[in-house]
């Protein structure tokens, strides 16, 4: 089985502005501030290009095992609608998308961790 937390397939399509893409093309890397630490987030052109070549959401995703997707609706990095789109594209019939209304990108609060552990436990019970 698979558990995804704030899964962001195809983020190179929607996660970068035209200005970001231009900077990547001209400078080979992009430095962005992040709320998750003091150091900037570094994205290299090679990383971005590999993401472009590995896009998934254009068609069916050939995954047939049970999948659980956890997504915070207050996530500023990955819009929660992305989890729904991913769920639609997965070939598996055993897909559940769990939205945490006040959850952020990390889903790291005690209640979020409890949800993750419970989700893992119930998924393991199905295998």
Language model: regions and residue ranges:
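The alpha/beta-hydrolase serine catalytic core
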Residues: 1-99, 104-123
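Alpha/beta-hydrolase-fold serine-hydrolase catalytic core, especially in secreted/extracellular enzymes
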Residues: 125-127
């Amino acid at each position: 089985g698979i558990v995804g937390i704030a899964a962001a397939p195809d983020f190179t399509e929607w996660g970068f502005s035209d200005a970001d893409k231009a900077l990547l093309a001209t400078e080979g890397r992009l430095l962005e501030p992040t709320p998750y630490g003091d150091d900037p987030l570094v994205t290299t052109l090679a990383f971005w290009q590999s993401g472009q070549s590995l896009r998934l959401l254009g068609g069916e995703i050939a995954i047939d095992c049970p999948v659980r997707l956890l997504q915070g609706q207050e996530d500023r990095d990955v819009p929660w609608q992305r989890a729904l789109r991913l769920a639609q594209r997965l070939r598996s019939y055993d897909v559940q998308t769990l939205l945490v209304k006040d959850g952020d990108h990390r889903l790291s609060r005690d209640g979020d961790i409890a949800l993750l552990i419970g989700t893992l436990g119930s998924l393991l019970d199905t295998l």
